[in-house]
Amino acid sequence: MTQMWWRDACQPLDTAAMDQARARQQQLTKPTGSLGQLEGLAIRLAGLQGRERPTVEQVAITIFAGDHGVVEEGISAYPQAVTGQMLRNFVSGGAAISVLARQLEASLEVVDLGTVDPSLDLPGVRHLRLGAGTGNFARQAAMTDAQLAAALQAGRDSALRALERGAQLFIGGEMGIGNTTAAAALACTLMGCPARELSGPGTGLDSAGVRHKAEVIERALVLHGLRADEPLRALGHVGGFEIAALVGAYLACAQHGLAVLVDGFICSVAALVAVRLNPQCQPWLLFAHQGAEPGHKALLAALHAEPLLALGLRLGEGSGAALAVPLIRLACALHGQMATFAEAAVADRPA
């Protein structure tokens, strides 16, 4: 690939705004540190937005969808037709993320990168059709170089559209039957873990199904000879269209100064790929929750991430990130609207 835009510099955090926010936190009518993670969250958002009192009113959600050839190996509890059917559900308003987006008054964009139904043509969906799903990575590379570049660019384009709409926070979601297998294969490569440690039930596999899934991943890793220091090659060989688009979106957000709220296991794997491709993007990634997939805890630890929630979620779609938005908004409201000791005429703790 000649156009490696993902290596471009990311925006720095505004340390002066963070210092101002930190000083404000120490003046608010509460014991310092008593609001726990919410205090650090407000301070970090101040650095990301370049203002002492950040707000998160404008939220952009993009769902990236794509099918996976590795489903041929019997690694999913659901048929591939569900991917296309869920695209219809997203835009008709019946999916979980559709409901959450309405409640949050967030924009919702749906991008079809390539499903097994090439005739799919849904109003309200951006159909890019990079292929009828990825190749079966148990037997061949998941993507060609051209497909990988196009998927990364699709994510970048979505992030730029969010910026044009005035977004203050970007949430990427995903849909693709078989994508926990692709995500686990990527994570195993980048973290150097055996597949059995990172393979989970996904949409509902039983214990035998999970063992088979791990075996498929292990065989694929041997086939492709992937290395932890080659994240782009790993993404192309065992990733997915939607995972690559998430990577592109996260990197573009960091390069253009838009905070990202990362969803669950699959999105966290995309975040790990993004960080390995361009470590400067890491400060721009906030992590919404620790999900039910057994590998998510280790993945978050590898990212040095402190998730906001732990609700046992395993839906995907960006739903866990959307659920964390009210908490972020409240953290900003507390930071911006609480009185200082001086304003409230309340005695502060003696120095």
Swiss-Prot record:
This is Nicotinate-nucleotide--dimethylbenzimidazole phosphoribosyltransferase. Gene3D superfamilies: 1.10.1610.10, 3.40.50.10210. The gene is cobT. Catalyzes the synthesis of alpha-ribazole-5'-phosphate from nicotinate mononucleotide (NAMN) and 5,6-dimethylbenzimidazole (DMB). It catalyses: 5,6-dimethylbenzimidazole + nicotinate beta-D-ribonucleotide = alpha-ribazole 5'-phosphate + nicotinate + H(+). SUPFAM superfamilies: Nicotinate mononucleotide:5,6-dimethylbenzimidazole phosphoribosyltransferase (CobT). HAMAP family: CobT. The keyword Nucleus does not apply. It comes from Pseudomonas entomophila (strain L48). The active site is at E317. The lineage of its organism: Bacteria, Pseudomonadati, Pseudomonadota, Gammaproteobacteria, Pseudomonadales. Coiled coil: none annotated. Keywords: Cobalamin biosynthesis, Glycosyltransferase, Transferase. One of its GO terms (molecular function) is nicotinate-nucleotide-dimethylbenzimidazole phosphoribosyltransferase activity. Pathway: Nucleoside biosynthesis; alpha-ribazole biosynthesis; alpha-ribazole from 5,6-dimethylbenzimidazole: step 1/2. Disulfide bonds: none annotated. It comes from the Bacteria. It is an enzyme of class 2 (transferase). It holds the Pfam family DBI_PRT. Its EC number is 2.4.2.21. GO terms for biological process: cobalamin biosynthetic process.
